[in-house]
Amino acid sequence: GGCCSHPACAANNQDYC
């Protein structure tokens, strides 16, 4: 859930997601 559930956010956090 959270950021990793949102493509735009996940794309900016690939190191975490």
From Swiss-Prot:
Tissue specificity note: Expressed by the venom duct.
Annotated localization: Secreted
Renumbered residue ranges of the record's region Ser-Xaa-Pro motif, crucial for potent interaction with nAChR: 5-7
Main location: secreted
Cysteine pairings via disulfide bonds: C3-C9, C4-C17
Modified positions (Cysteine amide) in chain numbering: C17
Alphabetical UniProt keywords: Acetylcholine receptor inhibiting toxin, Amidation, Disulfide bond, Ion channel impairing toxin, Neurotoxin, Postsynaptic neurotoxin, Secreted, Sulfation, Toxin
GO cellular component term, pick one: host cell postsynaptic membrane
PTM characteristics: C-terminal amidation, in synergy with sulfation, is important for activity and structure stability. Non-amidated conotoxins has a 1.9-fold lower inhibitory potency on alpha-3-beta-2/CHRNA3-CHRNB2 nAChRs (IC(50)=0.54 nM), and a 4.8-fold lower inhibitory potency on alpha-7/CHRNA7 nAChRs (IC(50)=367 nM), when compared to sulfated conotoxin.
A Gene Ontology molecular function term of the record: ion channel regulator activity
Sulfotyrosine found at: Y16
Comment text on domains: The cysteine framework is I (CC-C-C). Alpha4/7 pattern.
Homology family: Belongs to the conotoxin A superfamily.
Protein name (record): Alpha-conotoxin AnIB
Organism encoding this protein: Conus anemone (Anemone cone)
Lineage: Eukaryota, Metazoa, Spiralia, Lophotrochozoa, Mollusca
